[in-house]
């Protein structure tokens, strides 16, 4: 049906070659796959219902990258007035030295690291008529005069973990999900089988010495634990 299909990692191989945009760009200019067709149909239904001014994609892993680009491409072609942003683990690690202007055929903003304040400023820019050269941004790539620019010009500080709020799952259709275990390893069932409400217990890593991890990044090296009281309050709110 679709050679790129995976339960949770669609077209992951393409996303893993982050040192070059060529293969992904060629794929995006190819015909829609079977999975593309029904994904974009659902996306169109939601866009027509909500009529947003800004659409944001969180891309944590390579297996989420293609779908984000394909969806952004669809929005650009059919809803040109909607602004589009991308953030998450993948750009945080793989797009820190972004230079390829073609990425901005799909996205208007790409943010790095903690997302609360960058997204707040992106939102303010997206709904205002302010010229992008006059706007404030936090760790955000934009395209200006056909050049990729990294802007970090706000004096505002990131939000502390105690003030980011409690996740809202009220519109998540949990009763319509199925449990899928991709491999036989029973350890994987601990975090992939059934429903889990996940909460952030700390920002960053208290250890910060693993050689396989990029501990130079702020969202890893800046350790900020959350108090037990706040965690319990958030559990009760959920």
Positions of predicted regions on the chain:
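Radical SAM [4Fe-4S] cluster-binding motif and immediate context
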Residues: 167-238
């Amino acid at each position: 049906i679709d050679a790129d299909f995976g339960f949770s990692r669609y077209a992951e191989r393409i996303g893993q070659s982050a040192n070059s945009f060529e293969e992904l760009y060629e794929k995006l200019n190819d015909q829609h796959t079977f999975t593309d067709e029904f994904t974009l149909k659902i996306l169109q239904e939601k866009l027509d219902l909500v009529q947003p001014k800004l659409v944001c994609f969180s891309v944590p892993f390579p297996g989420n990258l293609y779908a984000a680009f394909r969806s952004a491409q669809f929005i650009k072609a059919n809803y040109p007035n909607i602004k589009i942003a991308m953030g998450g683990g993948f750009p945080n690690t793989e797009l820190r030295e972004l230079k390829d202007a073609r990425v901005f055929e799909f996205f208007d903003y790409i943010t790095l690291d903690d997302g609360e304040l960058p997204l707040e400023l992106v939102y303010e820019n997206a709904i205002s008529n302010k010229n992008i050269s006059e706007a404030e941004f936090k760790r955000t790539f934009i395209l200006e005069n056909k050049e990729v620019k990294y802007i970090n010009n706000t004096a505002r500080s990131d939000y502390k973990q105690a003030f980011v709020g409690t996740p809202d799952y009220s519109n998540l259709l949990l009763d319509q999900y199925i449990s899928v275990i991709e491999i036989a390893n029973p350890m994987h069932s601990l975090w992939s089988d059934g429903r889990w409400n996940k909460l952030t217990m700390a920002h960053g890593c208290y250890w910060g010495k693993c050689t396989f991890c990029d501990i130079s990044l702020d969202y890893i090296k800046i350790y900020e634990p959350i108090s037990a009281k706040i965690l319990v309050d958030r559990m009760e709110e959920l």
